[in-house]
Amino acid sequence: MTDPIADYLTRLRNAIMANHRVVEVPASNLKKEITKILFEKGYILNYKFVEDGPQGTIKVALKYDPATKENAIKFLKRVSTPGLRKYTGYKDMPRVINGLGIAILSTSKGVMTDKEAAQLKIGGEVLCYVY
């Protein structure tokens, strides 16, 4: 697999479109950090790291609105790919839906959202957009 982050986001998108409650994906340190951010920002209900074998898995419980049955994640898009990396400075930080969504960045200080990176005045690689 050439792009594990794109695979992770695609598995989440497919589970959302199929109205699954839980999706299980192979684990990596970068996927764990992205999952933590999605949980902190309220896009997923819960997550659990399962150490089964050398790699382990991440079980992600998707968040649905009980009244409308709509998922909290409306849009997931991979921005930087292995073939075409996208970097941004803190002054040129992308605004997702005029600040309503988040951009997840990989910086020298770790994986964080666009707002956290702008506060620390550091740029990085734009991994994905979520809203």
What are these regions (language model features)?
Residues M1-Y131:
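Core subunits and conserved enzymes of cellular information-processing
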